Regions:
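Glycine-rich Rossmann-fold phosphate-binding loop(s) that bind the pyrophosphate
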Residues: 73-75
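Redox-cofactor binding/interface segments in oxidoreductases and associated redox assembly factors
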Residues: 31-32, 71, 158
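Nucleotide donor/acceptor-binding cores
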Residues: 27-28, 51, 66-69
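A Rossmann-like FAD-binding core segment of flavoenzymes
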Residues: 3-18, 23-26, 87-185
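N-terminal Rossmann-fold NAD(P) dinucleotide-binding loop
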Residues: 78
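FAD-site-proximal beta/loop scaffold in flavoenzymes
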Residues: 41, 46-63, 159-197
Length: 197
């Protein structure tokens, strides 16, 4: 039987794990928090989520067969998923706010060589535009010149990082500057008995 964990806290030498089916006590906890895809927080993003806007190329790529797809980001996920999405899309635009990518050079080189990909650097997406039912285009802006343009596309895949899902831990666990829990090589945290994978 599955239970939803609501809170994890240290209680003396034990941990108190509160769930939707009651409280559990244990001597150690292995916590696998994962993360939530970061959003662009722009007009139209929420409205067209699932109607053109996606955060998972593997999950949703096939819905864009022979369509124009856009990808936002500059890291490994954005670069690798842009290449993956060329299996489906007639064209893939990769939009990145900087001139240089943070992704591995090998992945970027493969992307540059792909004839179905057009890379647009120094740009951000300002708005997702649709017809009320589905996404139809993006409004993008050059971050150096402030020049705006519209890009016709029916898909937007957002790969701009993850927000760590660490809200269940109520004790002061050490985190890095991005909010991810810090562990040693044994996956131990600063709280004895709390392991993070």
């Amino acid at each position: 039987e599955m239970e939803e964990v609501l809170e994890i806290s240290k209680d003396g030498d034990d941990f108190l794990v509160k769930t939707d089916m009651g409280d559990r006590r244990c001597g150690a906890v292995i916590y696998t928090p994962g993360g939530i895809p970061r959003k662009l927080e722009i007009p139209g993003e929420t409205e067209y989520s699932g109607k053109g806007v996606s955060y998972c190329a593997l999950c949703d790529g096939a819905f864009f067969q022979d369509e124009v797809i856009t990808v936002v980001g500059g890291g490994n996920s954005a670069v690798e998923e842009s290449n993956f999405l060329t299996k489906y899309g007639s064209k893939v635009y990769l939009i990145h706010r900087r001139e240089q990518f943070r992704a591995h050079a090998v992945a970027v080189d493969k992307l540059v060589e792909n004839p179905k990909v057009e890379i647009i650097t120094d740009h951000v997406v300002d708005e997702v535009v649709g017809d009320g039912k589905e996404m139809k285009k993006l409004k993008i802006r050059n971050v150096k010149t402030d020049e705006q343009q519209e890009l016709d596309a029916t898909g937007l895949f957002v790969f701009v990082g993850f927000t760590p899902n660490t809200d269940l831990i109520k004790d002061p666990v050490e985190k890095d500057e991005f909010g991810f829990i810090i562990t040693n090589q044994n996956m131990e945290t600063n709280i004895p008995g709390l392991f993070v994978a």
